[in-house]
């Protein structure tokens, strides 16, 4: 049974383009070592219609029986990641293949390759992602996507207790750091041995491009700073967003808000999220156009959306960045007590934005500039046109 499972897993790697045929024996021996097995007799078994989840379960059950791992979701996830890494190409090969495809066939072909690799390597556990609940709802603001994420494995009580008592480590500093690539993981940090990162340059600095293992939508990607540095919404944020969009114009890219009171992000590490998907907000129409003095070449308007959104469009992304920075600076310090908008209370700032960038035809687009306060886009549209600004 063990030898059949190993042969099937190696064949899966070959079929999916992870493992070259010439490395069949080499990969088989790597898996034998993982399973603490010295002997191997090539079994006669059906190698058609291999289901990865089933093969991994067979190997994990055997690893539990042999005392190699404990029988828990956490230990199984750590170990099957180790198994899958034996099939995967080294990081340099992935980078070289990505860049070659990008140069010869364009960005869409390159991201297609990388996304398929991330799924085939089981970094994205597609059989778990399928468990997520997804449906749409027609509203006055368009057809909204509603999802419930069920793909993150639940921690069992033993794993929770073990994580509490485990020795604390600061390596990697967080789950977004470059140092996660190839990391074996531990009881309180996921294994990332089958994880691969594409290095990119944005705003003249080193960043990483990867996919989210939980893919909330198609080609859900994460773009993160090569250094462990905090998130901050500023002019450089817009530059980084559009540098990425120029590299991958078929993707959108956005930043979560940089205030703890807003929540929903790892604020300790500068990063963005994006993907190849069209959300309802992108389709939402402009309900009121306006012009900002000095930026007449930038199209601006309020988006029909339940939250406060301003949409900016321009063929020259530098002009768009200039206006976005102007809006951000004014909004940070804007207070309107009658509208219950306060720049800060007790020294804690309240006003920030959630910028999302994309390319729409010949135009660069920043959509939205979403505030944390109600009716803010209308207020901004008015105050931006004041002569004293």
Swiss-Prot record:
Name of the protein described by the UniProt record: Galactose-1-phosphate uridylyltransferase
Compartments reported by the entry: Cytoplasm
GO terms of biological process kind: galactose metabolic process
Catalytic function, reaction form: alpha-D-galactose 1-phosphate + UDP-alpha-D-glucose = alpha-D-glucose 1-phosphate + UDP-alpha-D-galactose
A GO molecular-function descriptor: UDP-glucose:hexose-1-phosphate uridylyltransferase activity
Domain of life: Bacteria
Enzyme class: transferase
Keyword Lyase in record: no
PROSITE patterns: GAL_P_UDP_TRANSF_II
EC number, UniProt record: 2.7.7.12
Protein family (similarity comment): Belongs to the galactose-1-phosphate uridylyltransferase type 2 family.
Functional pathway: Carbohydrate metabolism; galactose metabolism
UniProt xrefs under InterPro entries: GalP_uridyl_Trfase_II, GalP_uridyl_Trfase_II_CS, GalP_Utransf_C, GalP_Utransf_N
Keywords: Carbohydrate metabolism, Cytoplasm, Galactose metabolism, Nucleotidyltransferase, Transferase
GO cellular component: cytoplasm
Organism field: Butyrivibrio fibrisolvens
PANTHER family: DUF4922 DOMAIN-CONTAINING PROTEIN (PTHR39191:SF1), GALACTOSE-1-PHOSPHATE URIDYLYLTRANSFERASE (PTHR39191)
